[in-house]
Amino acid sequence: MKYDLIIIGSGSVGAAAGYYATRAGLKVLMTDAHMPPHQQGSHHGDTRLIRHAYGEGEKYVPLVLRAQALWDELSAHNEEPIFVRSGVVNLGPADSAFLANVARSAQQRQLNVERLDATALMTRWPEIRVPDNYIGLFEADSGFLRSELAITTWLRLAREAGCAQLFNCPVTRIHHDDNGVTIETGEGRYHASRALLSAGTWVKALAPELPVQPIRKVFAWFQADGRYSVKNRFPAFTGEMPNGDQYYGFPAENNELKIGKHNGGQLIQSQEERKPFAAVASDGAEAFPFLRNVLPGIGGCLHGAACTYDNSPDEDFIIDTLPGHENTLVITGLSGHGFKFAPVLGEIAADFALEKTPSFDLTPFRLSRFSQ
């Protein structure tokens, strides 16, 4: 049997692509080295932020707004909502370049973003402490996503629509010829007209020419109380420290508040190097500078987890065909800020398989930018 699309890596982007391509009427085979959702990549840990006024650059805003519409649609398929509109407050010095990008994106796209000075911030959320030179940009329409629930839902919907799924089965090689793409696995060879390579952190095992660096990252849950919950209207947040360190976190659930540090981490080259949480001496204390200064009412570390970022050299996404192979789309280099975009990236992959022109300007995400 020849498929229209083979998906190599069915985590966040791959799971979404499998659903949207199958829903469009294509014959699709989803593959993964593990059983998604799993803890070997970048999508585990219960929750991920979604922000609309994007501090990483205005080029992302059309993508994230389409993603939000698709998240709302996906949530309708579940009794438990996948998207929680908690709001997101972005904290940092008034002269922060990141916050300037947030404000610029909000102005250009007429997004619902409120600017709060330090006094107004601490009045609205007495649990937060910031210096006088800090501001907050509050996105009331943003919030957080239940990442593993999202992947489970996409996989179920794709399967119900007739998608073939081959999990716990690593792809060992990819072959290209005039007839399409062939993959080799322990279960045999499979053929398709087109392929999506969305293998996340370890994409270089199949495409070593891609400029992707795996980074070991950690996040942790700390003791909290009801003041920090969604019921008390406590928001999700990003926070920039005076030294430039970037943190992110979520409202407390079951008296546990999850927080992580976006920058830093350990460069790794193999799955074995991604040691579990607490294997590196700094893991448990990584969030202390932020908690001590900004959220002093939070208690001790309860537990944590390790994950991996697939960083591109400029930490912008890679969305392009594999060099020399126009029938294979690569989506990688999501650099720790990609999950919120998973549905729109999956939709882009489905359009690729349908040979449709993308609805977005993907020029900023082409591989050619690294050779200029």
From Swiss-Prot:
GO MF annotation list: flavin adenine dinucleotide binding; N-methyl-L-amino-acid oxidase activity; sarcosine oxidase activity
Entry function: Catalyzes the oxidative demethylation of N-methyl-L-tryptophan.
Catalysed reactions, as listed in the record: N(alpha)-methyl-L-tryptophan + O2 + H2O = L-tryptophan + formaldehyde + H2O2
NCBIfam families with a match to the protein in the record: PRK11259.1
Name of the gene encoding the protein in the UniProt record: solA
EC number: 1.5.3.-
S-8alpha-FAD cysteine sites (modified residues): C307
Family: Belongs to the MSOX/MTOX family. MTOX subfamily.
UniProt-recorded name of the protein: N-methyl-L-tryptophan oxidase
